[in-house]
């Protein structure tokens, strides 16, 4: 599987944020810590495929709030880029996936549920 680096995530964030929004990282948050959670899950066999990996990027970035602005958009975009890097092309309703990312940020949807939804969408 292909992974996103911290530089990749920052670059994706810079592409999705509007110029009138507050740029940069949130001072008390760590992108490295969010990415370490993903590496940890991989080490312990909790990420079995690209869908699990993409869902972890989306959920952990949405909850982590590592940027001053555009965390949910960055989370979605990282999920989408992760899928694409790993040769998974999904067509989904942006309102539906947007709602799921918002719910992930609120702690209502977790990476397991999002991964299951991604697998379901792959079968459509």
Where are these regions (language model features)?
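FIC/Doc superfamily catalytic core
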Residues: 1-124
């Amino acid at each position: 599987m292909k992974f996103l680096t911290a530089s990749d995530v920052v670059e994706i964030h810079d592409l999705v944020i509007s110029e009138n929004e507050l740029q940069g990282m949130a001072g008390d948050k760590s992108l490295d810590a969010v990415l370490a959670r993903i590496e940890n899950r991989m080490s312990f066999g909790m990420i079995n495929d690209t869908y699990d990996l993409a869902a972890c990027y989306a959920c952990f970035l949405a909850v982590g709030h590592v940027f001053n602005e555009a965390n949910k958009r960055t989370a979605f975009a990282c999920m989408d880029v992760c899928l694409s890097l790993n040769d998974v092309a999904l067509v989904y309703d942006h309102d539906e996936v947007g709602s799921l990312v918002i719910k992930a940020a609120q702690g209502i949807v977790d990476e397991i549920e999002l991964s299951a939804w991604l697998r379901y969408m792959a079968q459509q």
